[in-house]
Amino acid sequence: MLDPKILRQNLEHVVEKLRRRGFEMDSDTFLQLENKRKEAQLAIQSFQTKRNQLSKTIGMAKSKGENPEPLMAEVSQLNDELKQEEANFETIQKAFSDFQLAIPNLPHDSVPDGKSENDNREIRQWGAPPGFDFTPKDHTVLGERDNQLDFEAAAKLSGARFVVLRGSLARAHRALAQFMLDLHTDQHGYEEVYVPYLVHEECLYGTGQLPKFREEQFQVAGDRNFFLVPTGEVPLVNLARDEIIEAPALPKKWVAQTPCFRSEAGSYGKDVRGMIRQHQFQKVELVQLVQPENSYQTLEEITRQAEKVLQLLALPYRVVELCAGDLGFAAAKTYDLEVWLPSQNKYREISSCSNCEDFQARRIQARWRNPKTGKPELLHTLNGSGLAVGRTLVAVMENYQQADGHIRVPDALKSYMGGVDYF
């Protein structure tokens, strides 16, 4: 959520920055709501002032032995009118809050202009795509051996965009997740956290999936108002809800492996085959809560930490800076990591690392105590995929495939795979 002070004091600037990301803010509606809010506030203050004055007059009348009943009746009438005005104010505040919740974050000044992923800027590449003396196969074909990648079984259980992994592929999937967790906890200093996979609706509001992306969420039937997590970012960031963290305890660095559940409502016809776009997939998520002045340095750090996974697995990739029009709803700046897939002869997204500044923190009131002032201030929240496990498995399968269809085990993964060289 944007700072209401910025909206009130520098509305034109906000409108222009939002226009960079293709969002047209209805400034007329904002001004109407703001005027109604001010009018309701003034009315409430006026009623309260009159009531206080009458209360004093009643006290004076009683002290003089005068009949206070007419004045008390007037106070009662004022109280009724005050309650009505307070209810009106709450209605206006709700409309104002709903209006704010629909506004995305402002892009950072360094974010390049652009309308879509076609305008994203490549920052760097690492590694060279492998050369094959045979035509490289798609991961779905490679997975047919011993039926280790079984989409038919998954369809029988759950329908399209699910997968059943068996044997060596299931083990490789588990090994990759464990390798990522070990790297981030042992070398990058993250605290591992196990979190619920069902969260309250307010958690999704807190991180920005709601209200805009409701159709992309899986909501659990019943009266508990649970949602399946679309990313580990949701429970991790919400751990700081309504917390005030002391400065020496910062930064908070949390990592979790969770399943992610997404309806892919806007992805009809995209990546219908294989494991690239699924309703359920595993992801290792990195989250940091930091002091505001450190957040852009931290964004570079998280990006490098996600890159380290790909480097240790010797998977060629590139880093792309998202243009303003391709930013996620809550992000002020984002880097995507895209891994090379030989069968597609192109790079595909495998990680997204974002600085949300105080956008999420304002929604969940995640704060730190500034030792200089002694007062609580909003934190900056950052998140990054470290990495998407299924897509990493796809990249390993395709980049390490052999002519006979077997997959060579990356050196970094051998100890997690029982020391075997191929699977």
From Swiss-Prot:
Pathway: Aminoacyl-tRNA biosynthesis; selenocysteinyl-tRNA(Sec) biosynthesis; L-seryl-tRNA(Sec) from L-serine and tRNA(Sec): step 1/1
Subcellular location: Cytoplasm
Homology family: Belongs to the class-II aminoacyl-tRNA synthetase family. Type-1 seryl-tRNA synthetase subfamily.
Residue sites binding ATP per the record: R262, S263, E264, E349, I350, S351, S352
This protein's name: Serine--tRNA ligase
Main subcellular location: cytoplasm
UniProt binding sites for L-serine: T231, G232, E233, E285, S385
Keyword Protein biosynthesis: yes
Subunit relationships: Homodimer. The tRNA molecule binds across the dimer.
A GO biological process held by the record: selenocysteine biosynthetic process
The organism of origin for this protein: Coxiella burnetii (strain CbuK_Q154)
Gene Ontology MF annotations: ATP binding; serine-tRNA ligase activity
GO cellular component, one term: cytoplasm
Gene: serS
Record keyword ATP-binding present: yes
